[in-house]
Amino acid sequence: MQVTSLLILVCFIAAFQVFSRASSPVNCKWDSYGPWSECNGCTKTQTRRRSVAVYGQYGGYPCEGSAFETQSCKPERGCPTEEGCGDRFRCFSGQCISKSLVCNGDPDCEEDGADEDKCENVANPSCNIDKPPPNIELTGYGYNVVTGQGKKRVINTKSFGGQCRKVFSGDGKDFYRLSGNILSYTFQVKVDNDFNYEFYNSSWSYIKHTSTEQNTFYSWKGLFSHSRNTYGHGSAKEEIDTKMKSYKLLVVQNTVEVAQFTNNNPEFLQVAEPFWKELSHLPTLYDYSAYRRLIDQYGTHYLQSGSLGGEYRVLFYVDSGSAKETGFQSDQDNACSSADFQFLFTSSADQRCMKQLETEKSTSGNKGRLLRGKPLVRGGDSGFVADLSFLDLDNPAGNKQRYSSWAGSVTRLPQVIKEKLAPLYELVKEVPCASVKRLYLKRAIEEYFDEFDPCHCRPCQNGGLAIVVETQCQCLCKPYTFGSACEQGVLVGDQAGGVDGGWNCWSSWSPCVQGKRTRSRECNNPPPRDDGKSCLGETTESKQCEDQDLEKLRLLEPHCFHSSLAPKEFCLSPPALKDGFVQGEGTMVPVGQSVVYACDEGYSLIGDPVARCGEDLQWLVGEMHCQKLACVLPGEMNGMQSHPQKPFYMVGEKVTLSCVGGMSLEGPSTLLCGSSLKWSPELKDAKCVQKATSTPPPAAPACQPWEKLQNSKCICKMPYECGSSLDVCARDESRNKILSLTICKMHVVHCHKRNYTLVGKESCTLPSPAEKVCGACPIWSKCDAQNGKCICREASECQTAGYRICVEVNGKEETMSECEAGILRCRGQSISITAIKPCAEEAAQ
């Protein structure tokens, strides 16, 4: 990838700069430490961080020591990984996976294999092959676009996700099984036999050209950093001699591809277990220090797609002044094309370009017939890299052989090249308060980028470009200029002229005024002068006082926010709307917040759908009503069913009626939706009646809810056949172990003669109520069609009652259905289930 090579190039360029006495060195200085973070309930530690107050520049020293400090502490909150997983399987680590992956023959719990730990046997293994493609783990690493380096693994490349997808190896000798996180994987070797050769009259030109080709947001924010993956040769004396010079560049490059891959969409990716743990440990109160540590370990992005292979790139440099004296000019003057330089690897030579390279060789201090450069190589055996640092002008076959040796090793030791990236915050999921943490990680990455904004640097002279490298600022100089501040040399040609302006850093955000905050910046780093260009962009910026996304999450997930930040005053439930409802309605809404109304299916809202909670705790509601648009059938049809079944029917549509359960229909069998939005004939004229039979069939036995009918007999259900049911704590008396069950499962295990006793809810950790999507609503909630999520039912809306149980509410026991109890719990009311059957008084009647 070009970004990485540019990162390494800057390190290479920095090695050949010298800091002139004309610019006084500026040493890096740390700012004071910030406050300690909240004590982490999992690690029992807290951290604090200090930022750079003054970046080192002009040869000054970098900051010493770490930006972070850690100490042990006593947490006030528990560890999120100790919580339950609802209806999913919980690995020993705390990570949750789908129950469909349990006992399928594949260890989908990445670190402990708990999903296969207690399986007596696996009747049908999900696949007959378990070998993944070689080096597949490379596709799951994080990536830091600021440093240009790969980081720790963020995607679980070992999980097959219960799938059996195979791919044939490139050499046709073997099959491999693909990870469930891989969308596509192809073994296709691509070797470009034609090398690419490019001349640049300065490192400045090279950076400008390559960043323009990248055309990405990070072209300037993420191009500059030290890298330890480069290989250089030459003594300290040679480096000191060359630091006082300005250079031209010849870049020779090529790539080798072994395989191509595309990762799945983020919502379908299973994150690596160590990364998942770190996400779980992140605080729900924004603390940049904690999120910054995650960025340091796992990067800013993850791999969306790319190739496994190797990249060969060598930079050859020539002193600009010597080149001018000896007649070696830029490619515009001597016009050596890529084809003209093939003589470096083939026997056919171009004398004009040979002379050009001989000039470069002599001016850059190379002796004999060897042309030395700086190899920037990714992939392949590192033992071959030293041989790639030079070209023998008299032995093109030897040059090609050394390259071929390295290229041949790429199949064994590939790296990811030609990668496409996606933001890391997309992978924040399957942890408590994931939506809040995702928003905070996005904010932290933006703040991290700001740390490397060149606005922190002092201006470079002669139009040089200031860049941030770790805790130091460096100047990238224009052609024929050099020095620590680019103060030496002379600008020539179209580079000469005035000084363009540069932005200073943004100010802090102002206090909140009329619902908005503002900040500003100045074009004075440096200010434009001598007809130089002014800065592009705005001098001021404004935003809402409260992040709208954060405010929405504060309502949907109030448990994710510190109690001191919670609103203190609320309006009661908003007024009801006939044939309509409030989207995402809670029991209480904070002052200043708004709710939005919507209409039932078959109705359209006329008027202003927004109501606001006023400061007087009264609802400010405009005129609105729901207007009927179609014919609607009632929810209860007394044994009748309709075909086709639809939420509503437009004018002219017909519906056919029939009866269920051996009943026969009396009255009209077909209804028409008329122009008045009424059924013709009327639905009340149709009804279902019992058929007269001479010999009624023998009645099937009436099974209990925890039983099922099999071969005309009632037998006990299995626990996995239970549907939606309330969670309770139960003690297994045979093992004296307390665990979480549901009311349905307790009835089932009792049916199987297992001795389980109901205990208090404080005796175990019950699964936290997770937000459900439509299609998975429990019996005490219903689907909100507007946002596709489940909301609490009203007590009168219970369609499936569940078991009759004994519940203590406000200190008094009463018998109610699971649905009724679930509605109370859904609405936040504290209840205690004292018996899984009706209360003793009612049971005795």
From Swiss-Prot:
Keywords: Complement pathway, Cytolysis, Disulfide bond, EGF-like domain, Glycoprotein, Immunity, Innate immunity, Membrane, Membrane attack complex, Repeat, Secreted, Signal, Sushi, Target cell membrane, Target membrane
Glycan attachment positions: N124, N201, N755
Domain EGF-like intervals: 457-487
Keyword Disulfide bond: yes
Family, as annotated: Belongs to the complement C6/C7/C8/C9 family.
Assembly with partners or alone: Monomer or dimer; as a C5b-7 complex it can also form multimeric rosettes. Component of the membrane attack complex (MAC), composed of complement C5b, C6, C7, C8A, C8B, C8G and multiple copies of the pore-forming subunit C9.
Keyword Glycoprotein in annotation: yes
Post-translational events: C-, N- and O-glycosylated. O-glycosylated with core 1 or possibly core 8 glycans.
Disulfide bonding pattern of the chain: C28-C63, C39-C73, C42-C79, C85-C96, C91-C109, C103-C119, C127-C164, C336-C353, C433-C560, C455-C505, C457-C473, C460-C475, C477-C486, C512-C545, C523-C535, C571-C613, C599-C626, C631-C673, C659-C688, C703-C714, C716-C751, C722-C744, C729-C764, C774-C783, C777-C790, C792-C826, C798-C819, C806-C839
Species assigned in the record: Mus musculus (Mouse)
Record-annotated TSP type-1 domain positions: 27-80, 500-549
Modulation of this protein's activity: Membrane attack complex (MAC) assembly is inhibited by CD59, thereby protecting self-cells from damage during complement activation. MAC assembly is also inhibited by clusterin (CLU) chaperones that inhibit polymerization of C9.
The protein, known as: Complement component C7
Main location: secreted
